[in-house]
A protein has these predicted regions:
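Structural motif marking the loop-to-transmembrane transition
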Residues: 1-8, 29, 173-176
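Short acidic/polar alpha-helix capping motifs at helix-coil junctions
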Residues: 3, 33-37, 74, 93, ...
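Conserved long hydrophobic alpha-helices within structured protein cores
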Residues: 33-45, 88, 112-124
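Soluble periplasmic/extracytoplasmic beta-strand elements of cell-envelope proteins
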Residues: 40, 81-85, 143, 160
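Extracytoplasmic/periplasmic helical hairpin
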Residues: 47-105
């Protein structure tokens, strides 16, 4: 009886530790993927957002460049949805033109990006600004990253981009 009780406790401990390890692996993969992709995205996108430093507006030539960048390139194949946000929650640019100009509540993840942090998580596609994404995907990896002015380093806007969770799920399975 004592041996059976010990086995139950050991088994329960293994389940708890196993679950914790999987969550830690998933968290690490999410953070690493978000950070690496944010650097990659920033290297292509920030050039087209520098006009925000002078007038707070996105020029039409820059909108067109973002459209080209996100549709026919390797970056566009990797990113399934993309948004540029202002600090007050207004969408300056989106791969879903229907939400451009609309204002949404500022979530903590958006606020932390305006404070200079890169933040990645599995997206809550129930949010109002995710209507387009919710219709096409069951789960997405969402990353918020600050976009800085080239000459001052001031944060001009925040880019938000979505990736499918296929790579994430593959890495977590491999780690198990």
């Amino acid at each position: 009886l004592l041996l059976a009780g010990g086995a139950v406790i050991l088994l329960a401990g293994m389940v708890v530790v196993g679950t914790w390890v999987v969550k830690e692996i998933e968290s690490g993969v999410i953070n690493r993927a978000g950070l690496m992709t944010s650097l990659y995205v920033d290297s292509f996108v920030s050039l087209h957002l520098q006009s925000l430093a002078s007038n707070g507006q996105l020029r039409e030539v820059d909108r067109a460049a973002l459209d080209r960048l996100l549709s026919g390139t390797s970056l566009g194949q990797h990113i399934v949805a993309f948004k540029i946000w202002t600090a007050d929650g207004r969408v300056l640019y989106s791969t879903n033109p229907a939400i451009v100009g609309r204002q949404f509540s500022v979530k903590p993840t958006l606020a932390s990006a305006f404070a200079g942090e890169v933040h990645s998580e599995i997206s809550d596609l129930k949010e109002p600004e995710n209507e387009f994404e919710r219709q096409r995907w069951p789960r997405l990896l969402e990353t918020y990253a600050p976009v800085r002015a080239a000459n001052t380093g001031a944060i001009l806007a925040v880019s938000e981009f979505y990736q499918t969770t296929d790579d994430l799920e593959r890495e977590v399975r491999a780690a198990r």
